[in-house]
Amino acid sequence: MMVATDRVSAFDRKLGIEIPDKGKILTAISAEFAKLADNWGRATAYFYADAPCPDEVNDFSLYQFDSYRVIRDAPELAGRFTFMANLRMFPVECIVRGYLFGSLWKLYEQGERKFCGIELPDGLVKGSKLPQPIFTPTTKAPEGEHDENITIGKMVDILNKAGLNGERWTDKVRMAMDIREFCVGLYQKACTYADGLIIADTKFELGLNSDGLILFGDEILTPDSSRFWDAETYVPGEEPKSYDKQIIRDYLAEAKARGEVNPTLPAEIIETTRERYIELYERLFGKIWPRE
């Protein structure tokens, strides 16, 4: 079971702050994209209400257990939890980037042009659309430490050491290539779907199920794991209107520049972030979020 809370993290640290309803919004967005991903031929580990009942659920008789009913009816978990197939997760984070932003832009600005084995051209500006989406995997660093960009070759080494064996995946180079294809493919499908919005980049996490199939796990295309921009106001080189955690990142970066240590988020930043998350959900799926 995966539970999404209202807690906030940024720059690889937990802030001890909550955004009201954030966990529910993330759960709803992930569930909607899980359904879309399955329709697009990108299988996920999600069990959702109107999906055919998976064998894992039938075998487990999940819905007959009192503990399930307790979880389902617990008010503190309402709208925040998702049942998922058990996966052996890959020890890498799978990032797809369609635009030059964030840590990639910082390195590019410093003169770097090769990222995870991929060469980018000169002359790009912050927020430029890349010639094509690029796959930039990273390590999974311990909490408080920064993830490290890695090449596909390094990713293969990590997969070899992870013990993810079986008849299907004796060739870890093929596994890495398939992971890349799955991630870039889902990103491209989502970009086409998200009319009026730009998905600048996103982070996926994947794993193997009991049959050795690669499935998407964890959150999928949420504003916590992705950057969403308003397409109408997007101008390369300018700060885009974002519907994600960038509002929080920008405030914390400004606070750090002012010399503040462990700054807190003011009420207006918290409320703006909540409203942007809600607006994103409504724009993506054409549904109204119940505001209280």
Predicted regions, residues:
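Active-site loop/lid in soluble adenylation, ligation, and acyl-transfer enzymes
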Residues: 1-141, 257, 261-292
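Short histidine-centered catalytic/ligand-binding loop motif
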Residues: 13-25, 141-180, 263-266
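Generic recognition of stable, solvent-exposed alpha-helical segments in well-folded globular domains
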Residues: 28, 174, 178-181, 243, ...
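A short glycine-rich, hydrophobically flanked beta-strand micro-motif that places a catalytic Asp/Glu
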Residues: 44-51, 192-208
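Coil-to-beta-strand transition motifs
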Residues: 89-91, 196-199, 210-214
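A long amphipathic alpha-helix within ATP-dependent nucleotide-binding catalytic cores
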Residues: 167-200
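Catalytic activation segment of kinase domains across protein kinase-like and atypical kinase folds
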Residues: 204-246
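A hydrophobic, small-residue-rich beta->alpha segment in the mid-to-C-terminal subdomain
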Residues: 241-264
